[in-house]
Amino acid sequence: MKHSVEEIHLKNGAKGLLIDIPGASVMATRVEFRAGMLYAKNKDIYELPHVVEHLAFGANAKYRNEQEFEAEFTKNGAYHNAWTSDVSVCYETECADFEWDRIMELQRVSICEPKFNEDELKAEKANVKSELTGYMNDYYRLLWPRVQQAVGEDVLDLAQRKETIANIELKDIREHYRRTHTARNMLFIIAGKMKGRRRKIIRALEEWPLKEGEKFEIPISDLKTGEAVSIRRKDASNITFGFSLVTPRHLPPNEVFAMNCLNHILNGTTNSKIFGMARKRGLVYGMGSSLASNASSSYWDFDGEVNVENAEELFALIQTEMMKALNGEIADADFEAAKSYALGRFQMGAQTPSQIADYYAENYVVTETLAKYDNMPN
């Protein structure tokens, strides 16, 4: 979708992006605070930011409980979500264009005027515990926090996170919210039709009743080469594997794009060098690789599942093809095919306001710099 993007600095200290998409029938918003797990006051209440996020759409200045708020918010089909990471707590909405201002007001109330209470806290602590218990049946979610710990990241694994839930009290919720949900610590991205409403949106955001606060820095981990991690599960019928190659720097968008092309060559389709060949040999049903880049480090991750009898041959194939890539043994035809595939997927990935907002968020919320969409194909 054709669009233009503008960075906005508000008088209250917040900043973000307004993305004008002429003719859009939907508006998408994303409001993010550096308030994730790494900003919990201490490790004994590590899961606190996650519980704060769960309480985001509960009781507030206008609605007595989550059910009343939900009924009002969704009555015309609007969608909302919230999520927590090591660094961020993020609140997202998507709505029909005709009710953008109503939804923005509801988002303001939920973010700026929550009414935390014991009843909802008790319920959401139980819900978070249930969520984490469910994740413990997902071997990938068991594996990756242990890998993070092995390379020196200051995180807890799922079992450790569950143990901290019982320690969280209402005073902790209120303290974390007051400290982290401030104007200077907020980034926003709003994508949709801006004509005739740009000033109204800016004025509305500047009137959000948030304290100025401070902008938190993203913690930097002292990364190291990690020892191999083994998690034994009696109920596991195969091997779930994962390994990560880490570099201690942020990758700019052009390098991320290049690495995604390499991921496609190695694991993108059944025509790829690792996954495709493994499928052809009957070694693996599914595996892949991906790239993630934060403020101070970047991760090239591989994972999948393999039957025990096929593991040695699969890992040998992975090693062989990765060494070829390291030595520059990539055919021109494979490189051109990866670029062609990437260009098509790039254009397909900008068909909705939410997709466009997510594209800009990937770089902006980490570095607070703007990677123009139209520059990427070059």
Question: Predicted segment positions?
Answer:
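Charge-rich, well-structured scaffold segments of protease-associated domains
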Residues: 59-62, 67-215, 220, 249-250, ...
